[in-house]
Structures are given as structure tokens and as C-alpha cells.
Amino acid sequence: MTTLTITRPDDWHVHLRDGDVLADTVRDISRYNGRALIMPNTVPPVTTTEMALAYRERIMAAQPQAHFEPLMALYLTDNTSPEEIRKAKASGKVVAAKLYPAGATTNSDSGVTSAKNIYPVLQAMQEVGMLLLVHGEVTTHEVDIFDREKTFLDTVLAPIVNDFPQLKIVLEHITTADAVTFVQQAGDNVAATITAHHLLFNRNHMLVGGIRPHFYCLPILKRATHQHALVAAATSGSKKFFLGTDSAPHAKGRKEAACGCAGSYTAHAALELYAEVFEKEGKLENLEAFASFNGPDFYGLPRNQETVTLTKQAWPVAESMPFGSDIVVPIRAGENIEWTVK
């Protein structure tokens, strides 16, 4: 039986939501991850240090595994102040701030309307060493949804990278060959997370033979050529790419609807899904760097000391999973996953 032992991984981009669902989402994310960076687009969004610390307490109250530490992020708005950034940095619990272009994704209506509005904040982040996390899509109606990422790179991110050369930036959940190239050509202060579902699927999986709402996420799945570029980047061993699931649960009825929500739930089996991709590419030896080394190295945090073991042993995913008083349909529901984590 094939086994692979790696340093305990981290998830550098996950949505846990809030309220009674935390018991379920925290259970899944803490099963084998050492740390997870918790996204702040809750309702209301986590816009202050006090809100971030209170949210962290609610996460810890949901009784994660003892080895797990939640890392917090601030939600940037047009009104975020440099003083708030300094306060967040001083807390020792908030490690990043997130740029959501207004209206780009779930609960992002309070986001930034123009990057220029937060330039004083970005300057403060550069000064104190706080990372900028970026949802890389424009939201103007004239830009096709499949082109939102490339347009963002050209019109928004490139100027930020140029104007703040010492600011560490993570381009989150990249979905295009254009983003891969952008990150590869940028300096060492620019990196990217890649999700399991963008490695495993392309837009055909979502649209051919009927609409499959559980594959609907933002940024949206792209054509296969972009998927192949993401797989090549993730499995390459490059230190610029690391694991961020963007696991984003919604209740089944919110997904299977006339106007369904964006987000795919993968926290139930994230490392196992990534292992399938790396095995298919013949690059299992690079999984540890992607899952366990590149993220903490970029964030300036120590690597985890413990290990986890993956075993090539298939197991069936449930058709649905508990989600507070409701249920969530996970990726690969009713199908087998080829790897098991012990």
C-alpha cells in the first residue's frame, strides 16, 4: 500500500462562516491542518481588529483539534485606516488584510471601490509587514466574467505591485495562465494560492450535460488550458505557489437554487484531493512544499513540526454533510477519493 508522510499542512485561504455552522466547519478544517487563514467576508464583515479577535474566540469555542491555530485577516473597505492596520499587526493574531473589489464575491458589497482609496492603508501595511491578500477580479459589467481576472492583473494589481515594491502580496485562488505568468514574473514579494477544485475541474465539468451548481465558485472555473497551467504551477515545486482551498460552504438549498451562491466545499478532504492531482502529474514529491512549506515561508512563520500520513486507500464521500441546522454538499459527494489521511 502506497503511503506518503509529509509535514503537517496549512490552509492559507478558507471560509468557516459564523454562528452554529462553526462546529462543523471548524471540525473539518482542524482535522489535520496546523493553521488556516480565515477569510473575513462574514456577515457583517470583519473590518476591525476587535471583530477579528472576537471571531477568533468563536472559532476556538467550536473546539478545534489541539494542534490547530486560526490566523485572522481584516476585510479592507474604503474607510479602513492606517491606524487599524497598526492595531491589527500589534495584536499578534491578525496576519493579513484582504482586498475584495466591491461586489466580486460572496459578502463583498462592503469591499473596496477603487484601489487608490486604500493607498494610505497599503503604505501602512508595507511599513509594518502585514500581507495583502487579493481577490483578483474586476467587477465592471462590461468585462466578461471569464476575463475578470486577467483584466484585474493588468489594471489593478500591476500598479499596486509597482507602487508598493516591499509589500508582500498573495494573489488568491488564481484561475488563469495569465495569473500564473504574472506571479512567476513578479518579485519574491508576490505569491499565489491555488484551490483543489481549480486543479481538478474546468468549466466543462460545471456546464456540460447539465448545470452542476456545486462547481460554481468565484473566480469561476475556466477553460482546460488554464486548468493545465494551474496544475503545472502547483506541482512544479516553485516556492511562489501554495495551498489555499477557498473552501466555501453554503447550505444545499442556497446552491441548488434559481440564483445559486458561489463556493465549493472541499475542507472535508482537501489534502486528499490535492494528492490526486500531484499523483496524476507524477509529482507527489512536491506536495509537501506546496502544502506545508511554501505558505509559512512566505508569511515568515515557522513550518509545522508534526507530520501527517497519506495512504493510497479509496473512501466514499457522503452525499451531504452537517452544516449547522442544514446540510452542505461537498465536492465529490457520492464518489470516491483515492487518498486517506491518517
UniProtKB/Swiss-Prot annotation:
Superkingdom of the source species: Bacteria
CDD domains assigned: DHOase
Catalytic residues (UniProt): 246
Gene Ontology process terms (BP): 'de novo' pyrimidine nucleobase biosynthetic process; 'de novo' UMP biosynthetic process; pyrimidine nucleotide biosynthetic process
Top-level class of the enzyme under EC nomenclature: hydrolase
UniProt xrefs under Gene3D superfamilies: Metal-dependent hydrolases (3.20.20.140)
Substrates-to-products reaction catalysed: (S)-dihydroorotate + H2O = N-carbamoyl-L-aspartate + H(+)
UniProt keyword terms in alphabetical order: Hydrolase, Metal-binding, Pyrimidine biosynthesis, Zinc
Enzyme Commission number(s) from the entry: 3.5.2.3
Subunit composition and interactions: Homodimer.
Protein name: Dihydroorotase
Protein species of origin: Vibrio cholerae serotype O1 (strain ATCC 39315 / El Tor Inaba N16961)
